[in-house]
Structures are given as structure tokens and as C-alpha cells.
From Swiss-Prot:
Pfam families: RNA_pol_Rpb6. This is DNA-directed RNA polymerase subunit omega. GO terms for molecular function: DNA binding; DNA-directed RNA polymerase activity. Transmembrane segments: none annotated. The lineage of its organism: Bacteria, Pseudomonadati, Thermodesulfobacteriota, Desulfovibrionia, Desulfovibrionales. One of its GO terms (cellular component) is DNA-directed RNA polymerase complex. Its EC number is 2.7.7.6.
Amino acid sequence: MARITVEDCLEKINNRFLIVQMAIKRVHQYREGYDPLVECKNKEVVTALREIAAGEVMPADSIEEAGVFLPATK
């Protein structure tokens, strides 16, 4: 597979700091038992970045309401 970077995710999310926070939150979700939304055999952080670049996870309108971004289904 091709390499994935934060720059690849900037097409979907215009804030690189939010992208990093989203990826961290997503890795925590994997460790809590959530399934990945894209097929990827890389490390968890790479899988999270692939999900963001694919538009599978998006930031929530209200961070207080939904955490850092809209949760994926379990």
C-alpha cells in the first residue's frame, strides 16, 4: 500500500492538529474494541489516518457533545 501522511488527510480536514487528535482518539477506540472502518494491516495510527483520509470519520459539530469526532459504530 502507498504511504499515508497527515498531509493526505488535509483534503478532508483542514486542521492538522485536529487530524492528530482524531487519530489518537481513534487508536484509543481500537484498543477499547471498536473495529477499523477501512481494511489495513498496518499499525493502529496508520489505520486511523487511512480512515480520516477516506472520510470515514469526521469531526463533530460540538466537541462537548461527541468528544473529538463523531464516534464509529461498534
